[in-house]
């Protein structure tokens, strides 16, 4: 089955995420910036990084390398155009986050913003845990269910409707329990309000130190 993300034009995705009724793009960028500032990681992995929203917050005096994974090659081409000569090493990996090799004990921070809803996250989570260094941080942003708005908010960018068949809400308790089983302990949790009655749930996990 073809991944629906491959059929979402960059302009549609950016327009949808930035539209007043969705308003998720600026929030996601800010949240990445906040975790970069708090964790101060040397090596970072961004899953589902799209066109690089939030990478403008990378401080190259602290972070020497950023790896971005996305399934859509056109998004990564645009990301490279946005950051042609960054002051940090920027590696772009195109592929499915479930299948692509992440390595072992490579990263100080793994950021997963609105990615778990679109993949088999119980399969991805152990791979993330293995890729984190001891004491490393997993930062997860989930979309919380809303009583007043569908999972994919209607906008003029109709191609986004293709994602409805892929989207699955993640039950927070299940995530926290599964993370604990992988040696990832919940350190902080917070809620971010969004337009149209939606909200994000943010989770920060720390990997057991050896």
Task: Enumerate the predicted regions with their spans.
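Short alpha-helix
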Residues: 164-183
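Core SAM-dependent methyltransferase catalytic element
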Residues: 182-210
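A short SAM/SAH-binding and catalytic strip from SAM-dependent methyltransferases
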Residues: 108-122
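Class I SAM-dependent methyltransferase Rossmann-like catalytic core
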Residues: 1-39
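Conserved class I S-adenosyl-L-methionine
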Residues: 137-170
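A short acidic, Gly/Pro-enriched loop at the edge of an enzyme's catalytic core
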Residues: 98-110
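Class I SAM-dependent methyltransferase SAM/SAH-binding core
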Residues: 43-100
């Amino acid at each position: 089955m073809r991944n629906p993300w491959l059929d979402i034009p960059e302009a549609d995705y950016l327009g949808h995420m930035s539209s007043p009724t969705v308003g998720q793009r600026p929030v996601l960028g800010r949240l990445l910036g906040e975790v970069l500032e708090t964790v101060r990681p040397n090596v970072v992995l961004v899953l589902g990084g799209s066109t690089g929203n939030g990478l403008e917050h990378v401080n190259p005096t602290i972070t020497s390398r950023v790896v971005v994974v996305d399934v859509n090659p056109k998004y990564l081409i645009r990301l490279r155009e946005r950051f042609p000569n960054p002051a940090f090493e920027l590696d772009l990996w195109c592929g499915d986050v479930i299948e692509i090799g992440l390595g072992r004990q490579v990263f100080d921070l793994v950021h997963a913003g609105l990615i778990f809803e679109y993949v088999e996250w119980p399969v991805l989570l152990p791979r993330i845990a293995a890729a984190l260094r001891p004491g490393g941080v997993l930062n997860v942003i989930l979309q919380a269910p809303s009583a007043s708005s569908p999972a994919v908010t209607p906008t003029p960018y109709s191609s986004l409707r293709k994602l409805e068949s892929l989207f699955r809400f993640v039950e927070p308790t299940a995530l926290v329990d599964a993370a604990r089983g992988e040696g990832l302990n919940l350190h902080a949790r917070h809620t971010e309000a969004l337009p149209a009655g939606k909200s994000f749930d943010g989770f920060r996990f720390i990997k057991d130190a050896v």
